[in-house]
């Protein structure tokens, strides 16, 4: 699930916090850019489908996955890839909505592509091609063959992967909160709701960098408890509340509670790595 406005809200608050405390240095910040080499020797879990969709939209799925794995290994990072299992019933409405949006984008793409044949003006052709590229990314579909090819690549490369019973993000968060991994690589902000205290976003294979979000430092900057933070996330709207139109505006949030470091991370059940986790198989995060 995604949380509307959360990233902008957090970034605005942290900028304000840093300005008020005359802290212009990124070092020690709640959000900072780090290099791959800074995670040498650390395990990270990866919400795999996010990057499969991204690389598929760029028509370089296997090449980019291979490059990602190679760069991780080169920098001493131990990756654990998590694949989605069946989607929860609660997300049925959203999945239907996304399927319809993909069909609309695909139809528009075909219409524009047909129109392009009769356009001779260079600037107009350039504009249409840019729109075609944008539309193409909106109706990317992963086939079972794509998933199997990526799993085969991971197996050949000796990389561990799991398939969750449900969505991958919950299992990713669980593995971080229970210290089976240092951080989770994902673009979904909802990992914070599950108590995942370190999230890596905006991966750049070209520059070998991530942007690290540190939940405990974020809570300190916001001056709120983890419980209050979760309430803000839920009110803001998630994939499970897509039928509601009232999402929380970034400017309307005025958290005044103080942080309680004892309840900032509250994982639920424990994972026994010797019994309940079977590499390259399915796993129940509960």
Regions found by a protein language model. Name each.
Residues 1-111:
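Non-catalytic, usually N-terminal nucleic-acid engagement modules in DNA/RNA processing proteins
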Residues 15, 20, 96-256, 283-286:
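Extended two-metal-dependent nuclease catalytic cores across DNA- and RNA-processing enzymes
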Residues 255, 259-279, 283-285:
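Periodic short-repeat tracts
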């Amino acid at each position: 699930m995604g949380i509307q406005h959360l990233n902008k809200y957090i970034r605005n608050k942290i900028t304000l916090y840093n300005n008020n405390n005359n802290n212009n240095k990124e070092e020690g910040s709640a959000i900072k850019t780090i290099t791959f080499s800074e995670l040498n020797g650390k395990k990270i879990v990866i919400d795999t489908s996010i990057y499969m969709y991204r690389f598929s939209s760029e028509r370089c799925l296997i090449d980019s996955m291979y490059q990602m794995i190679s760069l991780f290994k080169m920098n001493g990072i131990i990756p654990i890839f998590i694949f989605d299992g069946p989607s929860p019933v609660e997300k049925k409405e959203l999945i239907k909505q996304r399927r319809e949006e993909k069909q609309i984008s695909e139809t528009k793409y075909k219409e524009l592509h047909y129109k392009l044949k009769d356009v001779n003006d260079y600037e107009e052709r350039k504009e249409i091609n840019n729109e075609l590229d944008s539309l193409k990314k909106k109706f990317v579909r992963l086939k079972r063959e794509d998933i199997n090819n990526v799993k085969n690549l991971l197996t050949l490369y000796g990389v561990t992967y799991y398939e969750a019973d449900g969505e991958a993000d919950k299992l990713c968060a669980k593995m971080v909160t229970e210290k089976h991994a240092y951080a989770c690589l994902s673009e979904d902000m909802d990992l914070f709701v599950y108590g995942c205290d370190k999230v890596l976003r905006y991966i750049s294979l070209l520059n070998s960098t991530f942007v690290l979000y540190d939940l405990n430092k974020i809570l300190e900057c916001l001056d709120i408890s983890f419980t209050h933070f979760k309430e803000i996330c839920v009110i803001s709207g998630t994939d499970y509340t897509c039928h509601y139109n009232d999402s929380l505006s970034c400017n309307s949030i005025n958290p005044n509670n103080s942080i309680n470091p004892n309840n900032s991370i509250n994982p639920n059940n424990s994972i026994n790595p010797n019994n309940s986790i079977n590499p390259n198989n399915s796993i129940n995060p509960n």
